[in-house]
A protein has these predicted regions:
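Hydrophobic alpha-helical segments of integral membrane proteins
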Residues: 1-9, 57, 61-65, 235, ...
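A structural signal for short, hydrophobic/glycine-enriched beta-strand patches
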Residues: 51-232
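Extended, histidine- and acidic-residue-enriched regions that form the cofactor-binding/catalytic faces
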Residues: 16-18, 55, 249-252
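Membrane-interface helix-boundary motifs at transmembrane edges
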Residues: 30-38
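Hydrophobic membrane-insertion alpha-helices, especially the h-region
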Residues: 40-55
């Protein structure tokens, strides 16, 4: 799917967008004198927003995605010809900062470096827009030699990651197996796209970044039912993953 389609999917699967649409529609109905329909729309919109603002929803949605790719020691990973790490965890370096900012999912870069330093792969391919300024300095700081780092610097979404990295791998005929590093909740969709675009290469998941499992293990009522902006943001990511995965499977 293109970038514009991705943004539309993100908007229409956002719990906040859905809730606001329902509430505004309900208020319009009430203004037109349709009290029953308007009241129901406002109630459903409010309930929808509350559900997806809770840690309970995140433990269910995120935990299910993450448990598909359980935590694994680097020592248990197979040897591969390259590590592919998807970007998004490191803020691009700017003139106003001394060091790049670590964002949600920054442990992707650390895990890729960990894999290389364990001798499981000789090369890291960092894929994503701005990765030359973001992940490259951090990989070097984590001890990966610059000559062992390849950067694909133009991808704006996961499908572009898969397509552009597949082109890089096609130029490396000896590359038969890669370890794919991304957040555990993102792995299912990323694997689907990489295995489709790089069909001649064995793509092995090397997941990291487990938050849903931790949330599920620390689940406690009634605290997990209290709404928060952080949970709303995380659940928005999870819903986008589910819709993106099934949309890609159906449409492609």
């Amino acid at each position: 799917m293109g970038v514009a389609v991705n943004r539309m999917v993100g908007y229409f699967t956002s719990p906040l967008s859905v809730a606001l649409t329902l509430v505004v529609a309900g208020l319009v109905f009430l203004a037109l004198g349709r009290r029953r329909g308007g009241t129901w729309l406002v109630l459903v919109g409010t309930l929808w927003l509350w559900i997806f603002s809770t840690g309970f929803a995140y433990a269910v949605l995120g935990g299910r995605l993450e448990r598909m790719y359980p935590p694994q020691r680097v020592e248990d990973l197979p040897e591969a010809d390259a590590v592919v790490v998807l970007g998004g965890g490191v803020g691009a370096d700017t003139n106003s900062l001394v060091y790049a900012e670590l964002l949600r999912g920054a442990d992707r870069v650390l895990h890729a470096a960990r894999i290389v330093k364990a001798g499981k792969a000789p090369v890291v391919i960092a894929s994503g827009e701005g990765e030359r300024e973001a992940s490259l300095p951090l990989l070097k700081e984590f001890g990966v030699p610059e000559e062992a780092i390849l950067v694909e610097n133009e991808s704006r979404n996961t499908e572009e990651n898969a397509r552009r990295v597949a082109n890089l791998l096609a130029d490396r005929p000896g590359c038969r197996r890669v370890l794919l590093v991304t957040s555990s909740w993102h792995m299912r969709r990323a694997l689907l796209m990489f295995r489709r675009h790089a069909a001649d290469v064995e793509v092995v998941p090397a997941a990291i970044d487990y938050e849903g499992i931790v949330a599920a293990e620390s689940l406690a009522l009634p605290r997990s039912l209290a709404p928060s902006a952080d949970m709303l943001m995380k659940n928005s990511f999870m819903l986008k993953e589910y819709v993106g995965y099934w949309g890609y499977r159906i449409l492609r």
